């Protein structure tokens, strides 16, 4: 394996070590280790599916089971997944540090299965059904807190030379889960709203509940695979030894063997950078539908359909990028790619800044409704087209910025989508990979839990932030603030650049 020189540190992947010896591993251990890693890939995929498989149907399902639910409560239902995951991630991570990882994995997936079943039964209670849905989604998120355990296991079960590829694969499976979840929902929509009812257990299987039940069945299959195939392995940071860790005593032995403190500044900086990456991507996901409806006068149906196609294309693009970074990392390094990914994200949002003299089409509906008592006679003289429920389109006049802020052209929007679809997956993979190497041989469960919690907090706060800024201040302020936010992150990354090195490399330099 190639060695690295200090002078060539910038272009050498950080996954390499100058004093790496031969890896002591039998063929049986190698096979078991990689089959266990593949089970973790599947676990990550199913966790993502659990989030996305009901996303397109949550709003109509919520309205069906509880007519008192409004759009603001829908926001809480959507955010509850990330809140549950944010709370659970450090807890499961800490658990995995002191016990075999099979325990938190099985418990978390069991919670996810139970919560998915609860989601399918929220129609049963006589009242307060919306709160049962909120509870169900919270616990689905809580069960998905096992992603910290998954990433910490893969980080510990791979050598430095294997880790970037393994982390890229995890992110690719996560992205595929987000892409295929809505596809599963679309396929199951043929069941219809009525579906079938199993009276003995009060279960309604319809287009809203079938995806959740499918998620529960996949979770049960995941648990079976964990018991049948998953075995815990660990590769030390010098890649000289592979050990099995499948009992409490073996976990304790590993903890005692790892000496030396972790660079906490590098750890905190990595969490901050990861928060920024997830924060801006959550904003990107949230704003796509209202932005296109306001800028291009798309109807709700058009916005959902066209943005669904765009986001699916971005998802496919992201999977390709996830797989490509494994090759790029061998020629550059994680830090260089992270810096480049953030720069691409900044360009993507900068392109969205409005310019020119063309204004968006204005939706005057709100003004007309406010003065309808003065115009009843005038409107009654207009010939009827037979359609009494034409959906108003355009930028609502109640958003006063629509009157003086230039339109964002469709070419700007599509170019931004492409760039963000490149920058986000690069930053995602590099953040996890660098973070795992900074922690080194230490138990990574709790640390990965904090990183996952930072991402969950970002996915919770991002939509809240953008909904307020966009509605009241408009596109110029929204994307201007995001550009400033990403620019500050680039400066922060530059400041801590030399500290973002593997644990083993740091102690070689001391």
Curated annotation (Swiss-Prot):
Glycans are attached at residues 369, 374. It comes from the Eukaryota. GO terms for biological process: autophagosome maturation; lysosome organization. It is a multi-pass membrane protein. GO terms for cellular component: lysosomal membrane. A motif (Dileucine internalization motif) lies at residues 14-15. Gene3D superfamilies: MFS general substrate transporter like domains. Residues 60-72, 125-132, 193-209, 286-302, 357-406, 467-476 are extracellular. CDD domains: MFS_MFSD8. This is Major facilitator superfamily domain-containing protein 8. One of its GO terms (molecular function) is chloride channel activity. The chain crosses the membrane at residues 39-59, 73-93, 104-124, 133-155, 172-192, 210-230, 265-285, 303-323, 336-356, 407-427, 446-466, 477-497. May be a carrier that transport small solutes by using chemiosmotic ion gradients. Belongs to the major facilitator superfamily. The keyword ATP-binding does not apply. The keyword Transmembrane applies. Residues 1-38, 94-103, 156-171, 231-264, 324-335, 428-445, 498-510 are cytoplasmic. Keywords: Glycoprotein, Lysosome, Membrane, Transmembrane, Transmembrane helix, Transport. It is found in: Lysosome membrane. Its main location: membrane.
């Amino acid at each position: 394996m190639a060695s690295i020189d200090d002078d060539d540190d910038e272009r050498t992947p950080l996954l390499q070590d100058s004093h790496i010896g031969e890896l002591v591993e039998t063929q049986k251990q190698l096979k078991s280790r990689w089959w266990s890693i593949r089970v973790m890939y599947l676990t990550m995929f199913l966790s993502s599916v659990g989030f996305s498989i009901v996303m397109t149907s949550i709003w109509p399902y919520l309205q069906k089971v509880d007519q008192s639910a409004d759009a603001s409560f829908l926001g809480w239902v959507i955010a509850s997944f990330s809140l549950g995951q944010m709370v659970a991630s450090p807890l499961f991570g800490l658990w995995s540090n002191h016990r075999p990882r099979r325990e938190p994995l099985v418990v978390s997936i069991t919670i996810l299965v139970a919560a998915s079943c609860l989601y399918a039964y929220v129609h049963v209670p006589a009242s307060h059904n919306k709160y049962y849905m909120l509870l169900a989604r919270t616990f689905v998120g809580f069960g998905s807190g096992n992603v910290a355990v998954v990433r910490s296991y893969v980080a510990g079960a791979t050598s430095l030379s294997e880790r970037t590829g393994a982390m890229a694969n995890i992110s690719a499976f996560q992205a595929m889960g987000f892409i295929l979840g809505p596809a599963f929902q679309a396929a199951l929509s043929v069941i219809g709203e009525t579906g079938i009812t199993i009276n003995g257990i009060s279960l309604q299987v319809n287009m809203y509940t079938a995806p959740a039940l499918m998620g529960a069945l996949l979770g049960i299959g995941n648990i079976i695979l964990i018991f049948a195939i998953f075995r815990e392995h660990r590769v030390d940071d010098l890649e000289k030894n592979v050990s099995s860790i499948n009992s409490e005593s073996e976990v304790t032995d590993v903890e005692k063997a790892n000496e030396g403190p972790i660079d906490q500044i590098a750890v905190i900086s990595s969490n901050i950078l990861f928060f920024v990456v997830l924060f801006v991507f959550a904003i990107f996901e949230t704003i796509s539908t209202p932005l296109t409806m306001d800028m291009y006068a798309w109807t709700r149906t058009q916005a959902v359909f066209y943005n669904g196609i765009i986001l699916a294309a971005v998802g496919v693009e992201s999977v390709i990028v996830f797989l490509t970074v494994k090759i790029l990392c061998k020629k550059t390094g994680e830090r260089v790619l992270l810096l480049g990914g953030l720069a691409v994200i900044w360009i993507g949002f900068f392109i969205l800044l409005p310019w020119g003299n063309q204004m968006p089409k204005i939706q005057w509906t709100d003004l007309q409704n406010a003065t309808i008592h003065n115009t009843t006679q005038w409107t009654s003289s207009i010939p009827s087209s037979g359609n009494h429920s034409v959906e108003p389109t355009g930028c609502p006049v109640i958003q006063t910025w629509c009157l003086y802020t230039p339109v964002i052209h469709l070419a700007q929007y599509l170019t931004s989508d492409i760039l963000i679809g490149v920058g986000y997956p690069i930053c995602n993979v590099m953040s996890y990979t660098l973070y795992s190497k900074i922690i080194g041989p230490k138990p990574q469960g709790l640390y990965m839990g904090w990183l996952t919690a930072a991402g969950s907090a970002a996915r919770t706060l991002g939509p809240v932030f953008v909904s307020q800024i966009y509605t009241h201040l408009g596109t110029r302020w929204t994307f201007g603030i995001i550009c400033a936010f990403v620019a500050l992150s680039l400066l922060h990354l530059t400041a801590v650049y030399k500290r973002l090195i593997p644990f083993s490399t740091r102690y070689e330099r001391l």
